[in-house]
Each structure stands twice: as C-alpha cells, then as structure tokens.
Amino acid sequence: MSALLSESDLNDFISPALACVKPTQVSGGKKDNVNMNGEYEVSTEPDQLEKVSITLSDCLACSGCITSSEEILLSSQSHSVFLKNWGKLSQQQDKFLVVSVSPQCRLSLAQYYGLTLEAADLCLMNFFQKHFQCKYVVGTEMGRIISISKTVEKIIAHKKQKENTGADRKPLLSAVCPGFLIYTEKTKPQLAPMLLNVKSPQQITGSLIRATFESLAIARESFYHLSLMPCFDKKLEASRPESLGDGIDCVITPREIVTMLQELNLDFKSFLTEDTSLYGRLSPPGWDPRVHWASNLGGTCGGYAYQYVTAVQRLHPGSQMIVLEGRNSDIVEYRLLHDDRIIAAASELSGFRNIQNLVRKLTSGSGSERKRNITALRKRRTGPKANSREMAAVAAATADPYHSDYIEVNACPGACMNGGGLLNGEQNSLKRKQLVQTLNKRHGEELAMVDPLTLGPKLEEAAARPLSLEYVFAPVKQAVEKDLVSVGSTW
C-alpha cells in the first residue's frame, strides 16, 4: 500500500467537502498603486473585496464537487438554523412544529443511548413536545410505502415496454439516495436516462404532511417541518428546486441532535416516559401510528429491490425467489425463477467502489450476456433432470446486478444504516461494520412490518391532493469525462 494511502482514506462514503470550489466573478480588478511616474503610492488604502454569497442552490447547479461545502450546508440546514428559526416562529401563536424521523435515525439514537427502540421513540417525542412545544412527530414509513409502490409500478411498466419493443435491457437505477443522484447528475450524465424518477420517503413524507394540513385549511406558512435523516446529502435533497414545495424546512441528523442537546444542557434520558399514547397523540389527523412508525421487509434502506421481486412473484404463483450474494457484502440480488426462466431480478448495490464498477459495466455495452447464456442452457435441456440441473445452476450463481431489471443504489457502504449523520462516526472500520450489522438486526426485531404493495395505492388515493412524487433531473454536461471530483472528501 502506498505511503500516501491510509485506512482513513478509505471511508468510502459521501461527506461534505471542506471548501467550496464554485468559481465566482469578482467585479473589477485590483487597482495598481503606481502613479504615472512609476512611483508606488503608499497612501492608497487596500480595496475591500465583496463578500461572496453561495447557496445550496448554487451547490446543486455546480459540478465542482460531489456534494457541498460544509460551510454552505451548515449555513442553511443545521440544528443551529433550526434553533434560530423556530425560536422566532414559536413566538407566533399560529405557528406549530412538525418533526419527521427516519427509521435509521431512530435505531441509531436507541443504540447510542442504550435504549429499546420504543423507549428512544418516546424519549424523542417527549423531548420535542416538552422543549419545543412540537405538535406532531411522525415516522417516514407512509412516505416510503408510496415511494416503493410507485417504484414497483414503474419498473413493471418499463419492463413490459422493453419486452414489447425489444429496447435496450439495461437496468433502471434508483434515485432515492441523494448521494448517488447528485453524483450521477454532476459526473455521469449519460446514466441520467436510466434513473427511475420516484422521490424518496423524506420528500414524499413532506408532501403528505402538507397535503394533510391543506385538507384542514391550514396554510403552509403555519407550520415548520423539521426532518431527521441519516446523512448530510438529505439536506441537499430537500433543497432541490422541485423539492421546495414538499414542505421541509430543515434537515438535521442524529449527530446534530446530540450536539443540540449538549448545547441546551439537556439529558436525552431525562425525557424517558412510558406514555405510549404519544404515538397516537402526536400523529396528524388521518395518520395511523401503526403504519407511519412501522417499516417493511427488504432491508433498512427501503427494500425497493426486494419489494419489486415480491410484487412479480405474486403475479406468478409457483415462482421461487432466491437471494444471491455478490463479490462483497454490499451487493445482493433477488432473483425470481419460474420453470426454467429468470422472470424478474433486482439488486441492492452500495458503496462508491461498487458504483464505479456499475458505471463501467453500464457504459461498456455488454448488457445481454446473461440472456444469451440462459438461452444456451435452455437449448441444451433434454428432460426434467436437465431442467432441475439448470435451475440448480442458476440458483448457485453469484449476484449479477448489472443484468437486473432494477438496481437500488446507495452511496454509503453498508447502505443507509451507515449514513454519515448517524452516531457511528468515531468507530474504526471493523467496529463500524459490526455496528451496522447490529442496527440491521434490531431493525428486523424491533420494528413492526407492513406490506407496502398493498398499502401504497390506498395511501396515495387517500391523500387530500395529488402528491409530488417525481424529481426533475438536471444532469450537468461535461466537457471532459470525470470519474470523481471531490474537494476535501475521501470516498
């Protein structure tokens, strides 16, 4: 290993850049302090440069770095911004606070404070209710359910269209991870047509909250929505132009929650309570706490890949789903077999190294290899025994995400349970991986599971107004192909 490369350089997840590289135009140049005779004028006062203002919108439109300058993030999306803004708004009687919390953040806080998930939930709700007079606290599962339902619907329709037209069989790519979405838009615009255009649970939750209050004749200006998310790129996601109408005012992480408690001289555990009625009392009208505080099968990032294959399996009685592991723990494929055919496949792929391989595979034009191999196997079949051998061979294969119908992509290795905003930043690589495994296990044991395929259409239909469910992709054209441009950020 090179002396210039250390283990600390291999953290392989998106973090804010240390400096902004956005080029800015300076009006006028510096005046020369030299007179007509060539003499230096020492009496001339130095010019004062204008202060440059750069916003999150500038970051989203700039291709200088992958995410954003940390300074820019903190200036508009941080716990300090929340405290300042809500401190002013709370003085107005017609304003109220709404908080949404992702399941990854709930589990991270529970693990950090040594609590059960329910105890941590109640503690968090009690804290926001008592200290900030918060009116509603919700989980993000309802937003995730609709996101999954729309994703599955679009994948099935896209696959049918490809089969009818014989179009390119390259997979669709998820856009729910803002790190991967921003990376694609800024450095790999050729992949933008492959992005499946469905918003993330964070944004759809915001849209649902806004729709709920509009149905009650409550103006958007009457509430402040704070979102608790596992990574810093969620701040950028909430600042996308098409996301501004989703009703999310500020995004913070569990790390910022802990910092905020310290600054306020508050002990999180001092808000412990056994009052489970908080789940219902802090739910908006029409929001069932058994749903929005739940989760679903398929993984801690959403389970989009798993749920798609499950949906196709329900359409084909007798089909069999198998789970295939990839070359590393950050690749998994869900493959659906029926008779001698693979009728559906979807994969999960995490970490920037795997994303780099994904980009190379999808831009090399080798998208039909597996199809040819399966056809060859089918032609060699001579009877039931051969068919059984073929099925066994397919089942024994390793994950092949590049030939899936859909790939659920996450920038962080270990996916969302390893988000940069979670309470795991001080762990070494081995302990960090063990912590992710622990949190994944707790996710399956402590959260109730609901069926997004059944609930999704019902929730969307029940919404008081049409929801904002799609992004407006903005790929940045590159004069020169870039593989990675990041300032102060090691992947």
Curated annotation (Swiss-Prot):
Binding site for [4Fe-4S] cluster 1: C20, C59, C62, C65
Binding site for [4Fe-4S] cluster 2: C177, C231, C412, C416
Gene Ontology MF term list: 4 iron, 4 sulfur cluster binding; iron-sulfur cluster binding; metal ion binding
GO biological process: iron-sulfur cluster assembly
Signal peptide: none
InterPro entries: Cytosolic_Fe-S_CAF, Fe_hydrogenase, Fe_hydrogenase_lsu_C
Keywords per UniProt: 4Fe-4S, Iron, Iron-sulfur, Metal-binding
Purpose: Component of the cytosolic Fe/S protein assembly machinery. Required for maturation of extramitochondrial Fe/S proteins. May play a role in the transfer of pre-assembled Fe/S clusters to target apoproteins.
Oligomer and partners: Interacts with CIA1.
Family according to the record: Belongs to the NARF family.
Name of this chain's protein: Cytosolic Fe-S cluster assembly factor NAR1
Organism for this UniProt entry: Saccharomyces cerevisiae (strain YJM789)
